[in-house]
């Protein structure tokens, strides 16, 4: 049996299982403690268990397999990985491991990994010859992630508008700049749906930092990818740990030549968390940002790249503006030049209830000629020239109207030519 089968069960089902196996006071247990107790009882009765998880190596040299279901939070049902296994198989933090486990001995607190079956979906021997992420060659994105789908829904409107205004490629470092309450989380959700529908082979991770718990539940129920979160009631150290684990996991996948997309909401709150946990340097920038605080979030964002040797890491992150906080403005200014695609959402457009509320003139992609065929690129530039003299609201209203009136983007350009 697989440990994750128990971890994904609802708490009521786990309580029934606990009763079957004679575990007393089970309703007083936290979910992770309950899983630990059930697995222990079943293994004592001779049941064999396999496990999978993402490795986190601690400073002491040993590691634990953390579960994505608990957003990589340390718990009693984590699987211990010995330093010998880590050295033998050349393991790193972020490796996704599958193997067999044994029950803890009398003086032990955790289940231990006894046999390693696969690393990141490949045979363990393959991992000995992989190239480290830091040694891979970064390139501009050359393959477009098309978000257009054969639908007449609101989310397809978002995807088609992005394809026309600022196309996204595999390996894009994209910044979605938005004031609060104008639909940036909904836009991220729409992008997630479109990526999973059009590119099922792409590994999608949605990372929610400092978000509301109900939004986390909604996102995890509607998105087919992995949703990892740290809610606003958790400490800054937890936000940082979750972000680091997601980044390391994505890097390991790229080393295995996979295409990975991370949707981060939001990089502003992640930078605030780093600002809280980083040791004080004594140099404070405007708005209360420590001079050393933005290095690690920049390292996170800077990891997005298209890789010459195969694979890519795409990061689409939201940045908050117009919050009334000087710190948020400083964080945005620091990240402004680092991305190679920006999508600006406008409060004035959103107040007119025009969604997606994209400010067309401010949004765009660097080196878009590498992503889009030349004939389509010429049409996109003509569209921009046509919309540029208009007011932002008028331009968005015109674009949204024409998208709704056409079946797809090719039909949209034919409609434009006819006009």
Curated annotation (Swiss-Prot):
Residues 48-123 form the Rho RNA-BD domain. PROSITE patterns: RHO_RNA_BD (PS51856). It is an enzyme of class 3 (hydrolase). It comes from the Bacteria. One of its GO terms (molecular function) is ATP-dependent activity, acting on RNA. The keyword Transcription applies. Pfam families: ATP-synt_ab (PF00006), Rho_N (PF07498), Rho_RNA_bind (PF07497). GO terms for cellular component: cytosol. GO terms for biological process: DNA-templated transcription termination. Its EC number is 3.6.4.-. The keyword Transcription applies. Keywords: ATP-binding, Helicase, Hydrolase, Nucleotide-binding, RNA-binding, Transcription, Transcription regulation, Transcription termination. ATP binds at residues 169-174, 181-186, 212. InterPro entries: AAA+_ATPase, ATPase_F1/V1/A1_a/bsu_nucl-bd, CSD, NA-bd_OB-fold, P-loop_NTPase, Rho-like_N, Rho_factor_ATP-bd, Rho_N_sf. Homohexamer. The homohexamer assembles into an open ring structure. Belongs to the Rho family. PANTHER family: TRANSCRIPTION TERMINATION FACTOR RHO (PTHR46425:SF1). Facilitates transcription termination by a mechanism that involves Rho binding to the nascent RNA, activation of Rho's RNA-dependent ATPase activity, and release of the mRNA from the DNA template. NCBIfam families: PRK09376.1 (NF006886), rho (TIGR00767). This is Transcription termination factor Rho. It comes from Neisseria gonorrhoeae. The gene is rho.
């Amino acid at each position: 049996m697989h440990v994750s089968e128990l971890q994904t069960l609802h708490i009521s089902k786990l309580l029934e299982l606990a009763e079957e196996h004679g575990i007393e006071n089970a309703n007083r247990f936290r979910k992770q403690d309950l899983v630990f107790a059930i697995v222990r009882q079943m293994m004592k009765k001779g049941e064999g268990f396999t496990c999978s998880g993402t490795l986190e190596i601690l400073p002491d040299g040993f590691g634990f397999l953390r579960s994505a279901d608990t957003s990589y939070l340390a718990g009693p049902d984590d699987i211990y990985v010995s330093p010998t296994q880590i050295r033998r198989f050349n393991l790193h933090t972020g490796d996704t491991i599958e193997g067999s486990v044994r029950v803890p001995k009398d003086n032990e607190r955790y289940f231990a990994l006894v046999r390693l079956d696969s690393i990141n979906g490949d045979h363990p021997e393959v991992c000995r010859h992989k190239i480290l992420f830091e040694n891979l060659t970064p390139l501009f994105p050359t393959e477009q992630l098309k978000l257009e789908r054969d639908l007449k829904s609101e989310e397809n409107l978002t995807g088609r508008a992005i394809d026309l205004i600022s196309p996204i490629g595999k390996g894009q470092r994209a910044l979605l700049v938005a004031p609060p309450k104008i639909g940036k989380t909904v836009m991220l959700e729409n992008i997630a749906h479109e990526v999973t529908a059009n590119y099922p082979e792409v590994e999608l991770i949605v990372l929610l930092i400092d978000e509301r718990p109900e939004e986390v539940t909604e996102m995890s129920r509607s998105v087919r990818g992995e949703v990892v979160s740290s809610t606003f009631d958790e400490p800054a150290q937890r936000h940082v740990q979750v972000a680091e684990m997601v980044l390391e996991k994505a890097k390991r996948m790229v080393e295995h030549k996979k295409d990975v997309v991370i949707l981060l909401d939001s990089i502003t709150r992640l930078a605030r968390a780093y600002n809280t946990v980083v040791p004080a340097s004594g140099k404070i920038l405007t708005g209360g940002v420590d001079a050393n605080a933005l290095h690690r979030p920049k390292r996170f964002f800077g990891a997005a790249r298209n890789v010459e040797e195969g694979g890519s890491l795409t990061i689409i992150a939201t940045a908050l503006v117009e919050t009334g906080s000087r710190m948020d403005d400083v964080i945005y200014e620091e990240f402004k030049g680092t991305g190679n695609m920006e999508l600006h959402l406008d409060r004035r457009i959103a107040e007119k209830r025009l969604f997606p509320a994209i400010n067309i003139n401010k949004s765009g992609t660097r080196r878009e000629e590498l992503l889009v065929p030349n004939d389509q690129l010429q049409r996109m530039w003509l569209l921009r020239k046509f919309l540029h003299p208009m007011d932002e609201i008028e331009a968005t209203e015109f674009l949204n109207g024409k998208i709704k009136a056409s079946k797809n983007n090719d039909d949209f350009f034919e409609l434009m030519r006819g006009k």
